[in-house]
Design a protein with these regions (language model features):
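Lumenal/extracellular ectodomains and adaptor appendage modules
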Residues: 196-205, 209-210, 217, 222, ...
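Long, low-complexity, Ser/Thr/Pro- and Asp/Glu-rich intrinsically disordered
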Residues: 242-244, 248, 289-391
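Conserved "repeat-terminator" motif of extracellular CCP/Sushi domains
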Residues: 103-107, 182-197, 258-287
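Short solvent-exposed beta->alpha transition segments
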Residues: 24-85, 311-354, 365-366
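Short Pro-Gly-centered beta-turn/loop motif in secreted/extracellular proteins
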Residues: 138-162, 224-251, 256-268
């Protein structure tokens, strides 16, 4: 019997008799050390109903290649999974023992990855020896290399650089028995942690770039494409959004989320109340219209103040103790002839209780562009001119 073929038959018997210890030793080398659990996973895989026939055919082909004994043939074949991914390559290892060629049964391990988002993840687990992996934020990081089969590994994960930090005890689950061809494998994480995406409804009614998410009342910038997390979440997290219109803040509904139970982000939908925003818009429009009328009335009274050289005509329009008040008290007494005409309002903006009005007016044939700041009291529904600048 060809001795190389005998070594393959010996391996067959080890698999047949579930000799996990011997299989692990045969598959281990200077680069990789396989455990009995790795060997058990391999045996369970090749003995499964779906893979038994393919495994037998591959073993027979390897023995046939040995029988053919082609010159310079150092690789006799491979045991693969159902997608053609190499599991074990059987070849000469270049050594002889009493004129007998030794075979190497070289396992192919698969890299398994984890993905972090706005956090750093530190994983600690046992695989033959203690492992520690630091996964940086917004990166895919290799967790380790694993053989064929399914693994469920007790793991401690520490979340850092996140809104909610902490250490979690859970497990990572890995399934290499049905991974397709050339697919990157990610570990399924079983921890009390959360990560999610957020879609806002009715946000177009508010100002762009005014949105914030509040996660347990800690605000972060909103981005519809962003994944938020991963967050330490032993119980639940509170999430809602705020947005602004003319400085007024609006809030969405609040969602309390629990931990993730699969390897995908949760998809949250938060909605601003359209009726609330429309109601504010309607009331604010009336305020701005009233501000236009107010500034026109003020301009008429300002003309009187200049004509009579008496500040009293505008004293009820100008904010007390403002810089504008000091300035106008001097100006109305000057010898200059001032009479503003052709007042045209070009723009009105609001920010909370400040109304900003841009207008044009003429004086002695010259056109002036003036910007006014009005202070609005939403209780009395009254205005005071706080500042003005001519361009």
């Amino acid at each position: 019997m060809n001795n190389a073929k005998g070594q393959v038959k010996e391996f067959e018997k080890l698999v047949q008799h579930n000799d996990y210890n011997s299989i692990a030793k045969k598959l281990s080398n200077k680069e990789e050390t396989l455990s009995e659990n790795d060997a058990k996973n391999f045996v369970l895989f090749v003995k499964s109903k779906e893979n038994q026939e393919q495994y037998n055919e591959q073993i027979q082909k390897i023995k046939s290649n040995i029988d053919k004994n082609k010159d310079n043939n150092t690789v006799y074949g491979s045991i693969t999974d159902q997608y053609g991914n190499n599991l074990i390559t059987i070849k000469k290892n270049g050594k002889t023992f009493f004129f007998i060629d030794k075979l190497e049964f070289k396992p192919k391990l698969t890299s398994v990855y984890v993905k972090e988002f706005n956090n750093t993840g530190i994983y600690k687990y046992q695989q033959e020896n203690a492992k520690k992996v630091i996964a940086e934020s917004n990166q895919t990081t290799e967790l380790g290399k694993f053989f064929i089969g399914k693994y469920s590994i007790k793991t401690d994960k520490t979340i850092e650089d996140s809104i909610h930090n902490g250490t979690l005890t859970g497990k990572i689950d890995i399934d290499l028995s049905n991974r397709g061809n050339n697919n990157k494998i990610y570990a399924d994480e079983d921890f009390n942690q959360s990560w999610f995406k957020v879609k806002l409804n009715n946000d177009s009614l508010l100002e762009k770039n005014s949105y914030k998410l509040l996660i347990d009342d800690k605000d972060v910038d909103y981005n519809s494409k962003k994944t938020y997390g991963k967050y330490y979440n032993p119980t639940e997290l509170s999430v809602y959004a705020i947005g602004k219109l003319e400085g007024k803040e609006f809030k969405t509904n609040r969602i309390n989320i629990r931990r993730n139970y699969d390897n995908k982000p949760q998809n949250l939908k938060l909605s601003f109340k359209e009726s609330q925003i429309r109601d504010y818009e309607s009331k604010s429009k009336k305020v701005k219209e009233k501000a236009k009328s107010y500034i026109k009335e003020y301009t008429k009274e300002l003309n009187k103040a200049y004509k009579k050289k008496d500040y009293k005509y505008i004293s009820d329009y100008v904010k007390n103790n403002s810089q504008l008040e000091k300035q106008l008290k001097k100006q109305v007494k000057s010898k200059s002839k001032v009479k503003f005409k052709d007042v045209k309002i070009n723009n009105v903006k609001r920010d909370k209780n400040k109304i900003y009005i841009e207008l044009s007016k003429t004086n002695n044939g010259n056109v002036f562009q003036t910007k006014y700041t009005l202070d609005y009291d939403n209780v009395s529904n009254e205005f005071l001119v706080e500042d003005s600048h001519d361009n």
